[in-house]
Amino acid sequence: MAKLTRRSFVGIMAASTTALSMPSLAFGALPRVVVIGGGAGGATAAKYIAKDSKGAIDVTLVEASKRYYTCFFSNLYLGDFRNYGSIGHNYYGLAVNHGVNMVHEWASSVNSAEKKVYLGSGATVSYDKLVISPGIDLKFDSVNGYSPEAQSIMPHAWKSGTQVQ
């Protein structure tokens, strides 16, 4: 029988504590990473976590929209170098080519103590690690006199979509 030293005991305790802090690992499941936001940052993070882990990490991307239009390619559309449809991307490739689980719902809140993402439907998604990449949006009440109705008069064009078309 191998001699149990203080150093090996501390190592065993540290490893077991780490496993307990990641619930999916404690029960033999794959570690779970949830990414909130399917824009350029979130989709790229989900893709490379899944790709680089070679299936060793269960990756879920939470994004309400089923299609993402790249703001940074909108100039190609506006300059008549590309059509509008060509700057839009769905999430099919992430799911099929990289094994990313897609959840097309709004992430309404996060409980970091329970390691859960609450969805607009009331469902939850558990995680071991969380990436939050919601992208850009506008809080209309933060700009005096600006409202959702005013954006048709003075477009902000922060999000690619109808204001770009």
Where are these regions (language model features)?
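A short, basic/flexible loop-to-alpha-helix module at the beginning of a structural domain
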Residues: 15-29
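Redox-cofactor binding/interface segments in oxidoreductases and associated redox assembly factors
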Residues: 119, 132-133
